[in-house]
């Protein structure tokens, strides 16, 4: 790719809000279709739609505790992006543990929606697809978000918080793609559908 165009920072960019609004996770094997369906990153760096065979699990968290962080490194001419999703779930209880435990064995792909209205795919890469995968070449791309850690507990004092902080990490070979398709949460708020 030639460096033939720069970028412009507008006033709105300087006043953009930060923070994560919601986190959606599904197993890579649930991803049925992706648009555009190409074998390299789209030129405009967006995915316009994604359908799944099962709804996305929707994770809520304590306000201002969720984060998406990206760290790029270049080795032997290849740039890899380590993308981390972390969030804090307050109040340890069985229902929370059951949902979090499911992350220990899956191969998650995430959509991280920001308060700015932008959403980004984590754990999905066009650049590391299995070309023998037929109509779903992303199924075995090995860039999914793995559970890196679950940390938590309770403090000693009565007013201390208790809860768990979950961190998922994906090593992918392009910056997270912007997802511009629809996200529709279910009535109970536990899942969401994409289109």
Predicted regions and their residues:
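Mixed-charge, glycine-accented linear interaction segment located at domain edges/termini
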Residues: 129-195
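Short, conserved charged micro-motifs
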Residues: 94-101, 177-179
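Oligomerization/assembly interface segments of phage tail-like spikes and tubes
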Residues: 72-95, 160-174
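Short, hydrophobic/proline-enriched secondary-structure or compact coil segments at domain edges
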Residues: 20-27, 85-90, 105-115
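Short amphipathic beta-strand/extended segments with alternating polar/hydrophobic composition
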Residues: 58-62, 120-126, 180-181
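Short, acidic/charged, Gly/Pro-enriched secondary-structure junctions
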Residues: 100-126
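A general structural signal for short secondary-structure junctions and capping/turn motifs
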Residues: 76-77, 100-102, 111-112, 156-160
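Solvent-exposed edge beta-strands and adjacent loop segments
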Residues: 2, 10-86, 135-158
